[in-house]
Swiss-Prot record:
GO BP term, pick one: circadian rhythm
GO cellular component, one term: mitochondrial matrix
Quaternary context: Complex I is composed of 45 different subunits. This a component of the hydrophobic protein fraction. Interacts with BLOC1S1. Interacts with SLC2A4. Interacts with CLOCK. Interacts with RAB5IF.
Protein name: NADH dehydrogenase [ubiquinone] 1 alpha subcomplex subunit 9, mitochondrial
Post-translational modification: Acetylated on lysine residues. BLOC1S1 is required for acetylation. Acetylated by CLOCK in a circadian manner.
Record PTM N6-acetyllysine, positions in chain: K189, K370
Transit peptide, from-to: 1-35
Homology family: Belongs to the complex I NDUFA9 subunit family.
Gene that produces this protein: NDUFA9
Organism per entry: Pongo abelii
GO MF terms, alphabetically ordered: NADH dehydrogenase activity; protein-containing complex binding
Subcellular location: Mitochondrion matrix
């Protein structure tokens, strides 16, 4: 009897093993592989994993405009050399903008020609975005806008660079009251002399998430009333969106007919400074209390910020630039000639100004704010 019971146990165990094997086989056995036909494989741009043939050195890539230019170059499969002088942690945000090994970071010295030569010698495109809103003990406006661009242009020409793009300013003028804009004008001339085929980009004031244009005006609410020379009734501004500028620069790289030309990048609308600042405060849901401050008094206030040990909120030169009307340059090609439709300020202002709202108005609809009044002067 014991033997019979033992045989039944063995039989049950053997059946259990076979059942387990069958179940495991049925679970692990997946569906048959789908047979792909070449016609079914999606075609199109390869994105960051493609190869555009562009090897670009971008000076000033760690700045406001630079991050957008690097991103647009990276997303089309370009190899980008990024010279930097800052801490390595300040360039971390650029690393995901290109495929593995496509972004090369090299330390450089702006006053060392061998250092400049090293970062441009293997490139077919060089883009100069170097800029500074205020002068320091180490670099004044002449260094930043004249001497350094001249050296980069000369060494790029010697290295056989095919395209050189230099970013200036719409209001660059040798007779300007702004030292910033005077040196921008001289910089254009020395770059053109050193690299005759250079493409010069002349944008107006650029706005975007990290700008010093909309954010600067919006932060005035901390001081109570908003000082404006002549209340802003004598100044006209035509700001341009940072993404449009970066796309225009990249399209100029790809355009064989752009060599040797100057481009004026402006937004689609012109505004009186008063109406523009009023709109900025309306989007930020802040009380707008303008008061006329004579420019000589405004410069005196700016001088106080200049001598502080912190980053200056405003400088005397910025006061001048703030109250200079944006030029109209109809003889120069613009964004439209490079296939870019300029973005109105009203579509993107909320992206920049939402952080200036109080919690009560954080999610308020932008439709409740009237668009800024435009002018045609």
């Amino acid at each position: 009897m014991a033997a019979a019971a033992q045989s039944r146990v063995v039989r049950v165990l053997s059946m259990s093993r076979s059942a387990i094997t069958a179940i495991a086989t049925s679970v692990c056995h997946g569906p048959p592989r789908r047979q792909l036909h070449h016609a079914l494989i999606p075609h199109g741009k390869g994105g960051r994993s493609s190869v555009s043939g562009i090897v670009a050195t971008v000076f000033g890539a760690t700045g406001f405009l630079g991050r957008y230019v690097v991103n647009h170059l990276g997303r089309m499969g370009s190899q980008v050399i990024i010279p930097y002088r800052c801490d390595t942690y300040d360039i971390m945000h650029l690393r995901p903008m290109g495929d593995l090994g496509q972004l090369l970071f090299l330390e450089w010295d702006a006053r060392d020609k061998d250092s400049i030569r090293r970062v441009v010698q293997h490139s077919n495109v060089v883009i100069n975005l170097i800029g500074r809103d205020w002068e320091t003990r180490n670099f004044d406006f002449e260094d930043v806008f004249v001497k350094i661009p001249q050296a980069i242009a000369q060494l790029s020409k010697e290295a056989g660079v095919e395209k050189f793009i230099h970013v200036s300013h719409l209001n660059a003028n040798i007779k300007s009251s702004s030292r910033y804009l005077r040196n921008k004008a001289v910089g254009e001339k020395v770059v053109r002399d050193a690299f005759p085929e250079a493409i010069i980009i002349k944008p107006s004031d650029i706005f975007g998430r990290e700008d010093r244009f909309l954010n600067s005006f919006a932060s005035m609410h901390r001081f109570g009333p908003t000082p404006l020379g002549s209340l802003g009734w004598k100044t006209v501004k035509q700001p341009v969106y940072v993404v449009d500028v970066s796309k225009g620069i990249v399209n100029a790289v790809k355009d064989p007919d752009a060599n040797g030309k100057s481009f004026a990048f402006v937004g689609p609308n012109r505004y009186l400074l008063f109406h523009l600042v009023k709109y900025i405060f309306a989007v930020a849901h802040r009380l707008f209390l303008p008061f006329p401050l004579p420019l000589f008094a405004y410069r005196w206030v700016a001088r106080v910020f200049e001598i502080s040990p912190f980053e200056p909120w405003i400088t005397r030169d910025k006061v001048e630039r703030m109250h200079i009307t944006d030029m109209k340059l109809p003889h120069l090609p613009g964004l439209e000639d490079l296939g870019i439709q300029a973005t109105p300020l009203e579509l993107k202002a909320i992206e920049v100004l939402r952080r200036h709202r109080t919690y009560r108005w954080l999610s308020a609809e932008i439709e409740d704010v009237k668009p800024a009044k435009t002018v045609n002067i």
